[in-house]
Amino acid sequence: MVKKYGIVAIVGKPNVGKSTLINAIMRKKVSIISNKPQTTRNAIKEIYEDDDSAIIFTDTPGFHEPSNKLDLFLNHEIEVSYKEANVILFVSSMDKELSEDDFEIINLIKESNKENVILVISKAEVAKNQDKIDERVHQLNKYIQFKDVIQISALHVINIDKLINTIKQYLHKDVVTDYFRQKVEKEDKFIIAETIREQCLLNLNHEVPHGVGVEIDESKYNQEANHWIIKASIIIEKNSHKPIVIGQNGAMIKKISMAARKQLHEIYDCHISLTIFVKVENNWRENNNVVKSLGYKIKK
C-alpha cells in the first residue's frame, strides 16, 4: 500500500519530555520515563500508522559527554538517528532553561544538513504566559531556522494530532510492506529489560541507577495459557550496591519486581511470572563484551 512514509528523530537534552512525547504519539508506554537523566539508552524505534501514513519515530538518548563505553554507544545512537531521519523534532521544555546541551544538539542538527526541523515546545502549560514561549522560540531561531513550531503538552496529549499532521507535510509517498513493519518491531527482551530498568531508576538511590543494566536470562510464553515466564538479572557494578538493590529482607527487589510485573501485564495483557536476580559485573560499562551482551552496539 502506498502511504506517506518517513523517519522522524526526536532529539533534545535529557529530561525535556522526549519519552513522554513518543508515548503520547503511540498512546502506549514504549519508552521509559524517569526524573533522572540517561533513562533512554537505545534509540527506540516505534511505528505510527494511520490510513494515509506510516511514520517511524526514533526516541534518542540524551546527548552528554562520554565517560565510558556505554556513553559512547549513547552518543553514537544519536548520530545514527540524525543520519536516518527525514524529519527532526527538536524538543525544548519550558520547565528548563536553555543550556550548552541545547546548543550542542543544535550544532549536530546543523552538521546533519537536515532541512525539515520542527521545534517542539514541550510542557507549554508551565509557561506563565505566551510571551515566555515566544522569547524561547526567538532565542532558538537565532541559531537555527525551524520549518514549524508546535507547542504541546505530551502529558495531557494536547496538540499531538497537530504535530503529527505537521510532520506529514514533510514525508514522501512510498510502498509500506510487511517487511517494513517487522523491521521496526522492538524485541520483547528489550521492552522487558527497559521496564525493569525503569523501576530501578525510580526506586534506587542516586549512586546506583546508571550503573544498572538488565539481562533477560529466560523468556517463555505459553500461548494456550496466556502466561509469560521471565527470568532476568539486574547487573550492577559494585558489590556495595547489592544490598541496596536487594533491600532489607529482599524488600527492594520485591518492590521492583512487582512494579515491573504490573507494567508488563498492562503492556502485553497476559499473566506475567517475573523472577529477578542481582549480578555484580565490576565496571561493566567499560567492558565491551558485557555492554554488547546487554543489547548495546559499540561504535568501532
Swiss-Prot record:
GO terms for cellular component: cytosol; plasma membrane. Residues 152-154 are annotated as: G5. It is found in: Cytoplasm; Cell membrane. Belongs to the TRAFAC class TrmE-Era-EngA-EngB-Septin-like GTPase superfamily. Era GTPase family. Residues 59-62 are annotated as: G3. It is a peripheral membrane protein. GO terms for molecular function: GTP binding; GTPase activity; ribosomal small subunit binding; small ribosomal subunit rRNA binding. The gene is era. SUPFAM superfamilies: P-loop containing nucleoside triphosphate hydrolases, Prokaryotic type KH domain (KH-domain type II). Keywords: Cell membrane, Cytoplasm, GTP-binding, Membrane, Nucleotide-binding, Ribosome biogenesis, RNA-binding, rRNA-binding. This is GTPase Era. It comes from the Bacteria. Pfam families: KH_2, MMR_HSR1. The keyword Acetylation does not apply. Residues 4-173 form the Era-type G domain. Residues 38-42 are annotated as: G2. InterPro entries: G_ERA_dom (IPR030388), GTP-bd (IPR006073), GTPase_Era-like (IPR005662), KH_dom-like_a/b (IPR015946), KH_dom_type_2 (IPR004044), KH_sf_prok-type (IPR009019), P-loop_NTPase (IPR027417), Small_GTP-bd (IPR005225).
